[in-house]
Amino acid sequence: MAARLCCHLDSARDVLLLRPFGPQSSGPSFPRPAAGSAASSASSPSPSDESDLPLGRLPACFASASGPCCLVFTCADLRTMDSTVNFVSWHANRQLGMPSKDLWTPYIKDQLLTKWEEGSIDPRLSIFVLGGCRHKCMRLL
């Protein structure tokens, strides 16, 4: 089942923080799994992460040349959470005229994060529905 998460840029650490979105979204982030849990080592946090785990990583497929897994990143406008758009399709429409998909990573790192810092980011990028991706996570920048 997919989880609805809210994204925030932590400019001090240059990472995206993915927090639960819902009636109590101001509560703590995802708790760390217990030491004896059956979770795979690829999905469990490193010991250096705090107990209030900010999921400051995105799946490695997010910055791949072919784009993220289609079922992983879904954008939704905060005002109309019922109508979601596929992030890959949304991004493809935004990058029309770009010469190649090799610009995917520079676009995310330069354009998207700059807009985020300036506060002029499209509200559809504020919420992602994540689920089903088994790629390892990476740290942006």
From Swiss-Prot:
Location in the cell: Host cytoplasm; Host nucleus; Host mitochondrion
Keyword Transcription: yes
Pfam families referenced in this protein's UniProt entry, alphabetically: X
GO biological process per UniProt: DNA-templated transcription; symbiont-mediated activation of host NF-kappaB cascade; symbiont-mediated arrest of host cell cycle during G2/M transition; viral genome replication
A single Gene Ontology CC term: host cell nucleus
Residue numbers spanned by region Mitochondrial targeting sequence: 68-113
Keywords on record: Activation of host NF-kappa-B by virus, Activator, Apoptosis, Host cytoplasm, Host G2/M cell cycle arrest by virus, Host mitochondrion, Host nucleus, Host-virus interaction, Modulation of host cell cycle by virus, Transcription, Transcription regulation
Superkingdom field: Viruses
Post-translational modification remark: A fraction may be phosphorylated in insect cells and HepG2 cells, a human hepatoblastoma cell line. Phosphorylated in vitro by host protein kinase C or mitogen-activated protein kinase. N-acetylated in insect cells.
Residue ranges, annotated region (Disordered): 25-52
InterPro entries (alphabetical): Transactivation_prot_X (IPR000236)
Function (record text): Multifunctional protein that plays a role in silencing host antiviral defenses and promoting viral transcription. Does not seem to be essential for HBV infection. May be directly involved in development of cirrhosis and liver cancer (hepatocellular carcinoma). Most of cytosolic activities involve modulation of cytosolic calcium. The effect on apoptosis is controversial depending on the cell types in which the studies have been conducted. May induce apoptosis by localizing in mitochondria and causing loss of mitochondrial membrane potential.
Assembly mode: May form homodimer. May interact with host CEBPA, CFLAR, CREB1, DDB1, E4F1, HBXIP, HSPD1/HSP60, NFKBIA, POLR2E and SMAD4. Interacts with host SMC5-SMC6 complex and induces its degradation. Interacts with host TRPC4AP; leading to prevent ubiquitination of TRPC4AP. Interacts with host PLSCR1; this interaction promotes ubiquitination and degradation of HBx and impairs HBx-mediated cell proliferation.
The name this protein goes by in its record: Protein X
Organism of this sequence: Woodchuck hepatitis B virus (isolate 8) (WHV)
Taxonomic lineage from the root: Viruses, Riboviria, Pararnavirae, Artverviricota, Revtraviricetes
